[in-house]
């Protein structure tokens, strides 16, 4: 019984040690996540919409971004062979100053799951985007682009 008690006791100690390690890892992940959110929130984000008044640097950036999205989108739509008849979806893309896609989401759904997933796929596969112009970097660290996409087969 004493040997079994020691084994059980060691087993419980090992289990407790593993639990403590897991808690420490969870706490560390939580702290890192909070720091990332805090870092993201502390930087300025410029929101660009379809009818935003934009500076020349922003207008050029949006033009480059749109051309890159359209090139990738045309290729992906051909590959996927999805029927696109007058589908509309509104997307939000958050991009950092290096051109990395930080977040992609659907603001307004098309109502067709395949189309919404296609829009997200196009965003993700189009990244990375061009880095910001130095003038843009002086003003903000991220841009949030809100766009309506109208899908059609033709």
Language-model segment annotations:
Residues 108-114:
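A short acidic/small-residue loop/turn micro-motif
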Residues 48-59:
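A short, highly charged nucleic-acid-interacting micro-segment common to nuclease
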Residues 77-82, 134-135:
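Surface-exposed patches in mature extracellular/periplasmic domains of secreted proteins
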Residues 4, 62-66, 70, 116, ...:
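Extracytoplasmic/secreted envelope proteins and their assembly/folding machinery
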Residues 84-89:
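Short, small/polar residue-rich loop motifs at catalytic or cofactor-binding pockets
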Residues 1-17:
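Short amphipathic alpha-helical segments with a strong bias for extreme N-terminal helices
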Residues 15-49, 67-73, 96-108, 120-154:
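Conserved "boundary/linchpin" sites in short secondary-structure elements
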């Amino acid at each position: 019984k004493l040997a079994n008690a020691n084994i059980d006791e060691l087993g419980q100690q090992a289990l407790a040690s593993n639990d403590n390690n897991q808690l420490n890892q969870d706490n560390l992940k939580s702290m890192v996540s909070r720091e990332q959110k805090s870092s993201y929130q502390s930087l300025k984000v410029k929101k660009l919409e379809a009818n935003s008044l934009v500076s020349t640097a922003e207008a050029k950036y949006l033009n480059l971004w749109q051309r890159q999205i359209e090139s990738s989108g045309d290729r992906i739509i051909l590959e996927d062979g999805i029927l696109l008849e007058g589908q509309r979806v509104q997307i939000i893309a958050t991009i950092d100053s290096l051109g990395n896609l930080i977040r992609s989401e659907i603001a307004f759904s098309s109502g067709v799951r395949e189309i919404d997933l296609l829009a997200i796929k196009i965003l993700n596969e189009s990244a990375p985007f061009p880095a910001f112009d130095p003038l843009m970097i002086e003003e903000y660290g991220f841009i949030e682009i809100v766009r309506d996409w109208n899908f059609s087969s033709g």
